[in-house]
């Protein structure tokens, strides 16, 4: 058994050792706070503390200097009967608390103030981050409200119930759309010069079936169109050919092709005598044994066949040729003079001076007309 003095001595040694360890940590806290406050004399107190701190592994002997008024050490007494520690400080203030060690300064106030300041900073940051969004949303809501009010004010002032009823009527809307489409189509028809007449007529009939007034149709300036076409004559005889129908032009095409072949044959022949008189050639009857009939025989047979369908009582080829009402229609002027024959069947030829120069002058004009018609005529492309 240990004596009471030994136990007390042991407790004093333990308390001194524990006090030295605790004082080191509390001195560090105290030094940091003094640095923050800008107090003077930190180095001096630090020197005093370094003098009083024992080296590790050594027990600092108890001296009376620990309990002096200038000392900053905190001494812990052994546990009392009530289970509390008596905390002694240099300023003479004693505090008791179970299971805690307190320093002279009011650390609760410091920690609570720092905690409150951190909470205030956090709350301020939250308010700063949330406030712009809310303000933006609030501004947008206010602007939307203002725009809606302005729009509604305009609608209420200019509201027309009859017009609204008409818009709601589906039949009226369809009719308005149809009229708009028809007006655009009419505008296109009136400004399209290259439109097919048959297609144009079909479109106009379709528009009339929709109940459109006739005053809106056929408003195209026809006179100007004809005038423009008349200025575009690009080949010889265009004004004459424009009077023929498509069927007549097909017949003329066949006749011109046969005439070209016959003229080429006569041109490339090498007769022993001078160039024959074309009028005398007309007097000669076509040979029935000839394999290649001449243009005169071909055209006479064609007109005979055509005239027999129109006048069944015709008696002779020459009479049908001369009395055919289509003679002036199908034969150009220079050919009609060559094939002219009176009603008695006798051949009458015009002035000799004109016929002598036929092969030199008129044949060139015929070839020129044929070549122009075959190459540059848009009308020939329609015939083909």
Swiss-Prot record:
Sites bearing Phosphoserine, chain numbering: 112
Extent of Low complexity compositional bias: 13-27
A GO biological-process term: autophagy
Post-translational modification: Phosphorylation at Ser-112 is required for micro- and macropexophagy.
Region of interest (Disordered), ranges: 1-63, 266-291
Subcellular location: Vacuole lumen; Preautophagosomal structure; Peroxisome membrane
Protein's UniProt keywords contain Phosphoprotein: yes
Stretches with biased composition (Polar residues): 45-63, 278-291
Annotated keywords: Autophagy, Membrane, Peroxisome, Phosphoprotein, Protein transport, Transport, Vacuole
Gene Ontology annotations for the cellular component aspect, listed alphabetically: peroxisomal membrane; phagophore assembly site; vacuolar lumen
Membrane topology type: Peripheral membrane protein
Function: Acts as the peroxisome receptor for pexophagy. Required for both micropexophagy and macropexophagy, but not for the cytoplasm to vacuole transport (Cvt) or autophagy pathways. Required for functional micropexophagic apparatus (MIPA) and relocation of ATG11 to the peroxisome-sequestering arms of the vacuole.
Subunit structure: Interacts with ATG11, ATG17, ATG37, PEX3 and PEX14.
Protein name per the record: Autophagy-related protein 30
Lineage of the organism: Eukaryota, Fungi, Dikarya, Ascomycota, Saccharomycotina
């Amino acid at each position: 058994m240990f004596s009471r003095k030994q136990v007390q001595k042991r407790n004093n040694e333990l308390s001194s050792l524990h006090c030295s360890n605790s004082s080191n940590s509390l001195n560090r806290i105290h030094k940091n706070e003094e640095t923050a406050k800008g107090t003077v004399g930190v180095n001096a107190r630090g020197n005093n503390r370094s003098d009083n701190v024992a080296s590790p592994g050594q027990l600092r002997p108890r001296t009376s200097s620990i309990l002096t008024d200038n000392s900053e050490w905190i001494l812990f007494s052994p546990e009392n009967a009530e289970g509390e520690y008596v905390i002694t400080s240099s300023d003479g203030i004693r505090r008791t608390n179970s299971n805690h060690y307190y320093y002279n300064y009011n650390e609760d106030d410091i920690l609570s103030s720092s905690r409150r300041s951190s909470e205030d900073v956090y709350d301020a940051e939250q308010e700063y981050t949330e406030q712009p969004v809310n303000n933006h949303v609030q501004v947008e809501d206010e602007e939307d409200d203002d725009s809606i009010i302005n729009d509604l004010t305009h609608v209420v002032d200019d509201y027309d119930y009859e017009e609204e009823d008409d818009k709601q009527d589906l039949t009226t809307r369809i009719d308005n759309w149809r009229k708009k489409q028809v007006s655009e189509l009419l505008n296109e028809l009136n400004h399209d010069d290259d439109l097919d007449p048959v297609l144009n007529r079909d479109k106009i009939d379709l528009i009339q079936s929709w109940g459109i007034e006739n005053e809106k149709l056929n408003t195209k300036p026809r006179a100007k169109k004809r005038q423009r076409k008349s200025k575009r004559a690009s080949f010889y005889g265009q004004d004459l050919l424009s009077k023929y129908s498509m069927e007549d032009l097909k017949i003329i095409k066949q006749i011109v092709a046969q005439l070209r072949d016959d003229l080429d044959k006569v041109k490339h022949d090498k007769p022993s005598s001078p160039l024959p008189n074309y009028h005398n050639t007309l007097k000669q009857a076509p040979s029935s044994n000839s394999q290649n009939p001449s243009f005169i025989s071909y055209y006479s047979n064609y007109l005979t066949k055509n005239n027999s369908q129109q006048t069944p009582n015709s008696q002779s080829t020459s009479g049908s040729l001369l009395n055919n009402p289509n003679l002036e229609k199908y034969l150009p002027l220079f050919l009609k003079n060559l094939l002219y024959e009176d009603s008695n069947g006798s051949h009458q030829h015009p002035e000799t001076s004109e016929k002598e120069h036929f092969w030199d002058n008129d044949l060139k004009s015929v070839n020129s007309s044929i070549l122009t018609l075959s190459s540059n005529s848009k009308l020939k492309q329609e015939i083909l």
